[in-house]
Amino acid sequence: MTYAVQLPSEGPDDWAAWSRDLAARIRSLDDGEDVTITVPELARPHQVRKARAFGLIPARYEDVEPWVRVRRDEHHAVVEMVGSEDFGGLFFFTEPEDAALEALGWRRPGPISMEERVWNRWYPDDVTDTAYLPKDDALAAADLVTRTLRDILYSAQR
């Protein structure tokens, strides 16, 4: 089951409370379930067709809204975010935004061409022999999502 969350154009009134609620939701996921957060108001154009015939047929663009998904994969929470056009994803991030995402701990997809072209991060980061997601890892995953939305995507709007 997917839990869909659509954030308002200005973001939550209380980011800390929203992050705590997200951590609780993450810990309650059953295997294979996910929570997906979208922000339609922060959509950016993505080129889906280049100009052709010497510009007589113009390039075509579609708006792509940013999304972040946290899904449970056995004993891990896999956090994924719409990929940057820089590595073949669908969302236009500026170079400073790409650098900020890496600084937050997001990982670019590997060199395997079949791999989905999204930013990702696993919690816990290593093989685990514990039950699904300790509270600290759920809080860390929620914090990554919160800081990404608040400090990178929403701050670009201002």
Task: Name what the model sees in each region.
Residues 1-158:
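Structured alpha/beta or helical-core interaction and ligand-binding surfaces enriched in interleaved
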